[in-house]
Every structure is written in structure tokens, then in C-alpha cells.
Design a protein with these regions (language model features):
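Catalytic, metal-anchored helix/loop core of enzyme active sites in primary metabolism
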Residues: 1-387
Length: 387
């Protein structure tokens, strides 16, 4: 049986490293064709030595020489650098699936190229759908290529919808851990530090998504992602704070029945399901013990966690507004990680950026690129002026 050839965009990040573990556990089924990273050359080189891909790409061209030196004794591995190389590598003939595990707006262009090259997309880069959901879904339909969700919540919804055909969805119940500051007062939130925010209670994630989880912007982005993946309006998507992260999400149908997907918090499960769909494969992991897990659900506090409300506002407005929010969020997230922006200031800067960047109700790809640049500039200026 021919092994599926997989390209992992962002192999040194949290999702990428766990995807490599899945491939290693099922090496009889999957093979790594290509791995990519932005800056982490040492990690990328170590992965290349272990998995022997046909190619590696380092997005930061300044790290190319270092990567070349690290892999000097691996002549069979082709080494490329730059954003253009990312777009080109996903088009390589042997690739069957592309896992988009890179962070941020940078995931949009290679995803578009992969769809046009008729590759199955395993989508972990939520910003792609946040920024350009309509464009991506239209392309996927045009080229008849599936987009398989890797986010645990969207994988859960996808699994709940399996076998339901045209049965009408009444509501999507999107669960959120609530982050580490769920019970904080506004005064406590104002004093939150980077170190506080990077300690997530239930999931092991990269720095950017951990901060987004703490502000609940991550959940806002997942609402937008769900709208596009499942064709459900935002007003039919309800966010439930579920601190245990056992119920990964649920779907309520027109007869009132609710289907939920449960499991221990382990990102290998949704990654593996995207790789193996529609089949399920064994995974060596902890099993869910419902006797030791109480299940609690709460309404999110959108006054304390304003980013969630701003994301709903953006998707209702449509056009390039979600792109504006995403760009501003990338800037404030980095600003917070660099101690240049306070925890509560993040939502203030995003809100002001939303009102200051030109709105376009019918954006093209070029509009998204221009909007992204403008929103980043505006948000950065607001941080510098203490927006």
C-alpha cells in the first residue's frame, strides 16, 4: 500500500511536532515529504535528520546558510528558503496532504497554492479562514478539495456532523476552556503578565495561541472558522466555557438532539483523524475516565474578555473586517509577549484599529494583503502611542 505523502507547514511548532509523532506511530501509512519552519533552524534540521523528507523550507531567508550547514551531510534532502518557496513546495507532485500548522496570516498564500494544486488540506492555521474564509471555501469547492479541520473543536463538530447528511443544524456549541483568567476581576486582569498568560490550564500550545486563548480571541477566531467550515451563521454558534476541555464541541439539530465529541485533551487525536479520515486508527494515549472528570459549563463574560465580542462583531460585519481584527491581534499579541502592551490594552487597540482601517465589503486576495499591512501599521502605531 502506497504511503500518504504529507507536507507539514510549521513542523517545529506545537501542532507540527505532534503531527510528526502521529506519523511516527503510523509510519506504515504516512511519510513526511516536506517540513517547514519560520526561524527554528536547529529544530528543523533535527527533524529532517530523523524523518528524511524530500525537502525542507526555512521561511526566513537569513537562516538558509545555517540550515544548509546543519544538513551538509544529508545530500538527498533539498533545502529551500523564503515565502515563495513555501508556495511552490506545496505544489510538488508527490504530496497528498498539506498540514497547515504555521501561525498567522503567513498561512494564507501556501494554503491557496495547495488547494489549486489539488492537495487535501488539513487545516490547523485558523487565521487562513479568519482572514479569507469566503475565498478559501470558494476555491476548495471549485477544485473539489476537502478541508479537514485539525482544531480540536472543529474536528469535534466535523465528527458530530458525520452521517447527518442534510439534517438541519439548529446550533453549534463551541466549547472553550476559558483560559487561565476565567475567574479574574478586571483589576487582576490589568496586572496579568506574560508569564501568567503562558500557563494554560489544559492544553499544551505555542506562545501565540496560548495568549489568544487567555484573551479569548482564539475562541472568537474559532467562531469565524466554524462559520466558514460548516456554513452556519455566527448567530447560530454559541460559545460555552468548559474548563475541563473534555467536551470538545457539540452540535444541536432541528429535533433538539445534541451530539457531542468527548476525549482527553490531546491534539494528536484531531491531527490523526484528519490524516486518516474517514477511518480511525489506534493511538497510544490516555483514555477518558468520566468518573474522575466533572463536566461544567458557563457563559463567557464578554465584558471582561472583549476580544470574543470583537470577533463576533467582525464576522457580522463581514468583508475585510475579520482580516483587520486578525492583523491587529497579531500585533498586540506580539506586543504583549514583548512587554510593550498590557493585557487589557490588547482589546482596546484591536477595537480602535477596526474603526481606523478602510472597510471593504467585497475583498479580493490583493485587498486582504493590503488590509493586513494597513491594520498592522495602525495597531503598531496605537501601541507605540499607548493607544
Amino acid at each position: 500500500m502506497k504511503k500518504k505523502q504529507i507536507a507539514i507547514l510549521g513542523s517545529t511548532g506545537s501542532i507540527g511536532t505532534q503531527a510528526l509523532r502521529v506519523i511516527e506511530e503510523h509510519s506504515e501509512l504516512y511519510e513526511v515529504y516536506c517540513i517547514t519552519a519560520n526561524n527554528k533552524v536547529e529544530e528543523l534540521a533535527a527533524q529532517a535528520r530523523k524523518f528524511k523528507p524530500a525537502a525542507v523550507v526555512i521561511a526566513n531567508e537569513q537562516r538558509y546558510d545555517r540550515l544548509k550547514a546543519l544538513l551538509a551531510d544529508e545530500p538527498d534532502i533539498k533545502i529551500y528558503a523564503g515565502a515563495k518557496a513555501l508556495d511552490e513546495i506545496v505544489e510538488a507532485g508527490p504530496i497528498d496532504m498539506v498540514l497547515t500548522a504555521m501561525v498567522g496570516f503567513a498561512g494564507l498564500s501556501p494554503t491557496i497554492h495547495a488547494i489549486k494544486a489539488r492537495k487535501t488540506i488539513c487545516l490547523a492555521n485558523k487565521e487562513t479562514l479568519v482572514v479569507a474564509g469566503q475565498l478559501i471555501c470558494e476555491l476548495a469547492a471549485q477544485y473539489r478539495m476537502p478541508i479537514l479541520p485539525v482544531d480540536s473543536e472543529h474536528s469535534a463538530i466535523f465528527q458530530c456532523l458525520a452521517g447527518e447528511g442534510d439534517n438541519k443544524v439548529e446550533k453549534i456549541l463551541l466549547t472553550a476552556s476559558g483560559g487561565p483568567f476565567r475567574n479574574f476581576t478586571m483589576e487582576q486582569l490589568a496586572a496579568v503578565t506574560k508569564a501568567d498568560a503562558l500557563r494554560h490550564p489544559t492544553w499544551d500550545m505555542g506562545a501565540k495561541i496560548t495568549i489568544d486563548s487567555a484573551t479569548m480571541m482564539n475562541k472568537g477566531f474559532e467562531v469565524i472558522e466554524a462559520k466558514w467550515l460548516f456554513g452556519v451563521d455566527a448567530d447560530k454558534i454559541e460559545v460555552l466555557v468548559h474548563p475541563q476541555s473534555i467536551v470538545h464541541s457539540a452540535v444541536q439539530f432541528c429535533d433538539g438532539a445534541v451530539k457531542a465529541q468527548l476525549g482527553v485533551p490531546d491534539m494528536r487525536m484531531p491531527i490523526q483523524y484528519a490524516f486518516s479520515y474517514p477511518d480511525r486508527l489506534h493511538i497510544t494515549s490516555e483514555r477518558l475516565d468520566l468518573f474522575s472528570h466533572p463536566l461544567e459549563f458557563f457563559k463567557p463574560d464578554t465584558e471582561k474578555f472583549r476580544c470574543l465580542g470583537l470577533a463576533f462583531e467582525a464576522i457580522r460585519k463581514g468583508g475585510n473586517m475579520p482580516c483587520i481584527v486578525n492583523a491587529a491581534n497579531e500585533i498586540v499579541n506580539r506586543g504583549f509577549l514583548e512587554d510593550r502592551c498590557g493585557f487589557l490594552q490588547m482589546s482596546d487597540v484591536i477595537e480602535k484599529t477596526m474603526s481606523r482601517v478602510a472597510f471593504d465589503p467585497n475583498p479580493t486576495y490583493d485587498t486582504y494583503v493590503a488590509t493586513d499591512e494597513e491594520a498592522r501599521r495602525v495597531a503598531a502605531g496605537l501601541i507605540d502611542s499607548r493607544g
